């Protein structure tokens, strides 16, 4: 510690136990995290940064960031909707694309700057292959990818550029997490719920976010073989 600090330095520490402390510091970079129930949309946990006192900016719901490779699974999901199969072969090889007048040609690369020839769709998403993703986007059309991203509420009026297939457009972590819920719940569109219910001073519920109905709950008893059937009206993507 003598190499790091000198007498008079003001530092942050965290109390552990038995009069022991660990060093703590304000991070130079902040981030966000969202934990969501994929079936109801309830936000179970959300953090928008290190300290609300130091910054009220919520990096989970307000910060626009490029999702990058986190967007690729949606491109592959759309490919499955357009007659691709997990075993469809796609060329993983260098490609050069024109971006327009007076613009440099775009030459996307895989991470590691290697390419592997014909590979299956499954391999493309498992290994996060950039070149395969771009070729899929070329074949199914960037317009379809843009429309699909709007249906999932990831982007609003995205510019139809082929680079968006690699996650170049911007969105929030909350929107991206909501879209990922569709992979878990069978393709249903989820809206994030931050307020579960509101009750007045007498305990009466004046607002409830729960929209699902249990249509046979009255017919279910302890000895009954019937199980509660909870149905929702969520739309399929």
Q: Which residue ranges define each predicted feature?
A:
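A penicillin-recognizing enzyme superfamily signal
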Residues: 1-34, 46, 53-57, 127, ...
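Extracytoplasmic
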Residues: 6-10, 28-31, 38, 52, ...
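Conserved catalytic neighborhood of penicillin-recognizing serine enzymes
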Residues: 39, 84-145, 189, 201-237
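Active-site SXXK
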Residues: 40-41, 61-92, 124, 179-183
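Conserved structured catalytic cores and adjacent interaction surfaces
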Residues: 50-51, 79
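Short helix/strand-bridging catalytic loops that position acidic/His residues to coordinate divalent metals
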Residues: 54-65, 163-166
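Generic, well-ordered alpha-helical scaffold segments in large soluble proteins
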Residues: 78, 82, 127, 135-139, ...
């Amino acid at each position: 510690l003598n190499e790091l600090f000198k007498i008079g330095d003001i530092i942050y520490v965290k109390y552990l136990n038995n009069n022991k402390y660990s060093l703590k510091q304000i991070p130079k970079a902040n981030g966000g995290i969202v934990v969501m129930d994929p079936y109801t949309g309830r936000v179970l946990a959300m953090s928008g940064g290190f300290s609300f006192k130091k910054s009220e900016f919520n990096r989970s719901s307000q910060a626009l960031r490029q999702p990058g490779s986190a967007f690729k699974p949606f491109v592959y999901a759309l490919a499955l909707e357009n007659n691709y199969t997990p075993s469809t072969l796609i060329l993983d090889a260098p490609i050069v694309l024109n971006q327009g007048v007076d613009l440099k040609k775009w030459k996307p690369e895989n991470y590691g700057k290697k390419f592997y020839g014909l590979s299956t769709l499954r391999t493309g998403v498992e290994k996060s292959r950039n070149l395969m993703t771009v070729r899929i986007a070329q074949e199914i059309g960037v317009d379809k990818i843009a429309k699909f991203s709007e249906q999932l509420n990831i982007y609003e009026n995205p510019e139809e550029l082929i680079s968006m297939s690699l996650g170049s457009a911007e969105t929030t972590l909350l929107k991206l997490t909501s879209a990922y819920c569709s992979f878990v719940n069978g393709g249903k569109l989820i809206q994030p719920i931050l307020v579960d219910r509101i009750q007045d001073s007498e305990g009466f519920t004046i607002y409830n976010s729960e929209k699902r109905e249990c249509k046979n709950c009255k017919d279910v008893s302890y000895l009954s073989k019937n199980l509660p059937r909870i149905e929702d009206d969520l739309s399929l993507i």
